[in-house]
Amino acid sequence: MTEQKQVKKPSARRRARECTVQALYSWAVSGNTAEQVELAFVLDQDMDGVDKPYFRKLFRQTVENIETVDFSISPYIDRAFDELDPIETAILRLAVYELCFELDVPYKVVINEAIEVAKVFGADESHKYINGVLDKIAPALGRK
């Protein structure tokens, strides 16, 4: 008898975070407005299983608060923003937005979700980098 590992389907919120990272990436590299990116994303992407209102909230609020988010990240990264991988930047931006503004989400959940999203979209070792940066940022924001 062979055992099959059951693959757990990502939660609707995880899918919302994955979509938010993709939309933040698109926004950063395309030069399009947040509204254009959001509309194109919702129309063109597979949004099955996504908590769409949560996606919209995360994307809009991260963009709206981008200066605060980037200011919070800057002291904890080892290079300039423009030298970071754009996917890593998008993941960090989303996670730091959540750490700063979504206080009902436990910081361990924020960090774990960022790591899991990095495993899906990032380079081979990017989840380790994301974890290291967020482990420094969370206490600085009073989230530990």
From Swiss-Prot:
InterPro entries: NusB-like_sf (IPR035926), NusB_fam (IPR011605), NusB_RsmB_TIM44 (IPR006027). One of its GO terms (cellular component) is cytosol. GO terms for biological process: DNA-templated transcription termination; transcription antitermination. One of its GO terms (molecular function) is RNA binding. Pfam families: NusB. Keywords: RNA-binding, Transcription, Transcription antitermination, Transcription regulation. The keyword Transferase does not apply. PANTHER family: ANTITERMINATION NUSB DOMAIN-CONTAINING PROTEIN (PTHR11078:SF3), N UTILIZATION SUBSTANCE PROTEIN B-RELATED (PTHR11078). Involved in transcription antitermination. Required for transcription of ribosomal RNA (rRNA) genes. Binds specifically to the boxA antiterminator sequence of the ribosomal RNA (rrn) operons. NCBIfam families: nusB (TIGR01951). Belongs to the NusB family. This is Transcription antitermination protein NusB.
